[in-house]
């Protein structure tokens, strides 16, 4: 049988041509798909890298990581007798909006180690506001960074930037749910200038609530600041615990605390004593040969069935005759006391409602500026009323609070100081 070679060769050539075209199209399609896949994956990998950079994560499996904190802001309406205005503020240093990174790891039975990093927002610090300054602050501030080693039987030792043993020991006895909102520290209103008649003076309200221990116009909690140091806390035994600390350079503190229930009452007690000899604890220096000691005691009593409560604080600062750098004047010994009473009841399904009144006096807490103005004694008084509504579903509190402060000054032509009034409306939400 004879084959037509020409015809057969043409058919083979045609088949090869078609196969080549199909193969080329398939290769092109495969290359295109690969290119699209690479572009897609590259975008996805970039996004994953972005998320990894911003995600909170545990550094290892042994140590836990908890992120917590709160946001607290208020609108403060103030009246100095002539001028009126409204500012949006935070709650003051050490109580400002913050977030905390806390870690813990179990080492052995009854033993653990951990750390704490606390960063606060000081961008709207009320202690820096006055008639001419509506917004002031330093922005984010690393308030605490420390590690600790804890034993259930022996207690806990902490090293780093931390609250020392007696910091706020009297103030933190307040379990009413209003401690951040209303306390005896002059967090708001202290930087405003005094007004005598219609004239503004160079002196401020905080010049009559001055603490030499920390060289700031705190009013109360005079040695209440964090610093680099070492702190020891004992285990709680039947509700009682003790603390001791050393901070640079030099600050020694001891404190005792109790919390419990006695005869149908919730009880919280605290007392502390500190000695500070660091002229540069918070620059600029104000003292020659500083030697400030501060004693504080506080308590809280709440009747469990009715919700009626009382919170009380006493503080006394002794400066042992130290002289101020400017003018060579003697730093006065001073004291303060504070009462807050009210009721805490759940009248609403939202959560507890707290209604309270407060009163405090700050005696002879004269700053270097007040001493140089000729003041020899003073009595700054402050009273207020407030209400707080807790919202349990959001771990949130909202409040309204009114305060008035007055001052009587001895030894200087400073009679007729006009009272300062302010009303605050705000909220705090935990996370």
Predicted regions and their residues:
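Bacterial N-terminal signal peptides that target proteins for export
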Residues: 2-15
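Beta-barrel outer-membrane channel/assembly domains of diderm bacteria
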Residues: 3, 31-167, 225-226, 230-235, ...
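C-terminal segment of classical bacterial N-terminal signal peptides
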Residues: 19-30
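Surface-exposed coil loops of outer-membrane beta-barrel proteins
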Residues: 83, 87, 126-138, 158-243, ...
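Detector for outer-membrane/organellar transmembrane beta-barrel domains
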Residues: 255-390
